[in-house]
């Protein structure tokens, strides 16, 4: 799976890349929200990990843009933040974030959250396949015509 990282802090970005690559992910790392948005529009990412506070475009605005972007597949978004207040959490969820990881990064916590993301993405892919393969039933009778 290819993951887009948006993190302006070089040390945090390098740590994220190292952890993710060690886990076998393909990583595209960007230094701010503007670069991340451009990369997102050019590539196909099922997972985005973004810092909240960044120059150019912050993580919340990046999240909003991703949610408004027309694409065929759902993108799971994990926000990274040093802000841990309820207001910050709710604002992120309202912007469209799926999950949060707090700084400083804990590799074990990140791995656990990535496993959750993979399960949800896999479920969504399976559900999309089911929708295409199986037309809805009407009153217990298949809607296919013979």
Question: PLM features: residue spans?
Answer:
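Charged docking surfaces used in two-component/phosphorelay signaling
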Residues: 14-22
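Short hydrophobic/Thr-rich beta-strand motif most characteristic of the beta2 strand and flanking loop
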Residues: 24-31, 39
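Active-site beta3 strand of CheY-like receiver
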Residues: 43-49
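Receiver (REC) domain active-site loop signature in two-component systems and cognate sites
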Residues: 54
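C-terminal output helix
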Residues: 105-118
